[in-house]
Swiss-Prot record:
<keyword id="KW-0597">Phosphoprotein</keyword>
<keyword id="KW-1133">Transmembrane helix</keyword>
<dbReference type="GO" id="GO:0030497">
    <property type="term" value="P:fatty acid elongation"/>
</dbReference>
<comment type="subunit">
    <text>May interact with enzymes of the ELO family (including ELOVL1); with those enzymes that mediate condensation, the first of the four steps of the reaction cycle responsible for fatty acids elongation, may be part of a larger fatty acids elongase complex. Interacts with RAC1. Associates with internalized insulin receptor/INSR complexes on Golgi/endosomal membranes; HACD3/PTPLAD1 together with ATIC and PRKAA2/AMPK2 is proposed to be part of a signaling network regulating INSR autophosphorylation and endocytosis.</text>
</comment>
<feature type="active site">
    <location>
        <position position="293"/>
    </location>
</feature>
<dbReference type="GO" id="GO:0005789">
    <property type="term" value="C:endoplasmic reticulum membrane"/>
</dbReference>
<keyword id="KW-0007">Acetylation</keyword>
<keyword id="KW-0456">Lyase</keyword>
<dbReference type="GO" id="GO:0007266">
    <property type="term" value="P:Rho protein signal transduction"/>
</dbReference>
<feature type="active site">
    <location>
        <position position="286"/>
    </location>
</feature>
<keyword id="KW-0444">Lipid biosynthesis</keyword>
<dbReference type="InterPro" id="IPR007052">
    <property type="entry name" value="CS_dom"/>
</dbReference>
<feature type="topological domain" description="Cytoplasmic">
    <location>
        <begin position="211"/>
        <end position="212"/>
    </location>
</feature>
<dbReference type="InterPro" id="IPR007482">
    <property type="entry name" value="Tyr_Pase-like_PTPLA"/>
</dbReference>
<dbReference type="GO" id="GO:0007254">
    <property type="term" value="P:JNK cascade"/>
</dbReference>
<dbReference type="GO" id="GO:0045070">
    <property type="term" value="P:positive regulation of viral genome replication"/>
</dbReference>
<dbReference type="GO" id="GO:0031965">
    <property type="term" value="C:nuclear membrane"/>
</dbReference>
């Protein structure tokens, strides 16, 4: 005996570019919905007029449609959307003139052609308005947002490093050399904040928000945080040494010239004195900072050897103990290599800025 094919109730509506079909099946499982040779094929397990069964139907469309139907399942029905290949109104849904018994208009969504024309015109106007706004307003808006973001970032960093610089300077004039030994406990929190925030600077260079080369920014970020978090931050014996003062002072002295220069660049201002300081003060300050960091690393080697912190033993068959001081010695080599890379980068910047004036003098 031939199995009876069960068809669900299907309601349809249209717009100029789309067809909508609502299949009256609840609790649908395993739906198979596809379009081949301009025919919509539907088959699914669900609860319909004949109870919980497998329902299916096939509809050959009146005109050409795109072969990728979209559908959405709800608890009570299946909503199918089909894109027309041409934007025009159909007089009926199917190629056969006689409407299938299971098919009916969806009066909840139905529009006549004049209503649909008005809706289409409204959507087109909305799209054109959106494109015009994007074309006219978007580039300027994005540029302003970028400038505002960079200005605020540089301002926050300037305030942070200025606080450190002023704090260290005032305490030195009041306490003299005694101020060297508790530098870490007085300004470490602010230095942690500024150096963690410096990650943003590296990311800006990496994603193209700024034109800064990634390598110099990354070298400075990793180098400083190695000193701050590992050498100083993990060993209390290092936090009371005078070298902390010189490291923090050189870092903050460099940044109080660099960040205000970047701030003014965001608003297209050029203060000649500040520009000269930004392109000149690094010449003595970067080597002093590098020397201070090297002294800090050298002083920390016996401290790490004595404590054994971060040391580890290689697994069998090597079974060799690797001290953290080995990595500190490697870092010393990398420190001066990084200094060379940054020095070279800054020298090129200075030559681009002032090189032409020197040529004109000869």
């Amino acid at each position: 005996m031939e199995t009876q094919v069960l068809t669900p109730h299907v309601y349809w509506a249209q717009r100029h570019r789309e067809l909508y079909l609502r299949v009256e099946l609840s609790d649908v499982q395993n739906p198979a919905i596809s379009i081949t040779d301009n025919v919509l094929h539907f088959k699914a397990q669900g609860h319909g007029a004949k109870g919980d069964n497998v329902y299916e139907f096939h509809l050959e469309f009146l005109d050409l449609v795109k072969p990728e139907p979209a559908y959405r399942l709800t608890q009570r029905q299946v909503n199918i959307t089909v894109q027309k290949k041409g934007s025009h109104w159909w007089e009926r849904l199917t190629k056969q003139e006689k409407r299938p018994l299971f098919l009916a208009p969806d009066f909840d969504r139905w529009l006549d052609e004049s209503d649909a024309e008005m809706e289409l015109r409204a959507k087109e106007e909305e799209r054109l308005n959106k494109l015009r706004l994007e074309r006219e307003g978007s580039p300027e808006t994005l540029t302003n947002l970028k400038k505002g973001y960079l200005f605020m970032y540089n301002l926050v960093q300037l305030l942070g490093f200025s606080w450190i610089f002023v704090n260290l300077t005032v305490r030195f004039f009041i306490l003299g050399k005694e101020s060297f030994y508790d530098t870490f406990h007085n300004v470490a929190d602010m230095m942690y904040f500024c150096q963690m925030l410096a990650l943003v600077e590296t990311l800006n260079a990496a994603i193209g928000v700024t034109s800064t080369p990634v390598l110099p920014a990354l070298i400075q970020f990793l180098g400083r945080n190695f000193i701050l978090f590992l050498v100083f931050g993990t060993m209390e014996e290092m936090q009371n040494k005078a070298v902390v003062f010189f490291v923090f002072y050189s870092w903050s002295a460099i940044e109080i010239f660099r960040y205000p220069f970047y701030m003014l660049s965001c608003i297209d201002m050029d203060w000649k004195v500040l520009t000269w300081l930004r392109y000149t003060m690094w010449i003595p300050l970067y080597p002093l900072g590098c020397l201070s960091e090297a002294v800090a690393v050298i002083q920390s080697i016996p401290v790490f050897n004595e404590s054994g912190r971060f040391s580890f033993t290689l697994p069998y068959p090597v079974k060799m103990k690797v001290r953290f001081s080995f990595f500190l010695q490697v870092y010393l080599v990398m420190l001066f290599l990084g200094l060379y890379i940054n020095f070279r980068h800054l020298y090129k910047q200075r030559r681009r800025r002032y090189g032409q004036k020197k040529k004109k003098l000869h």
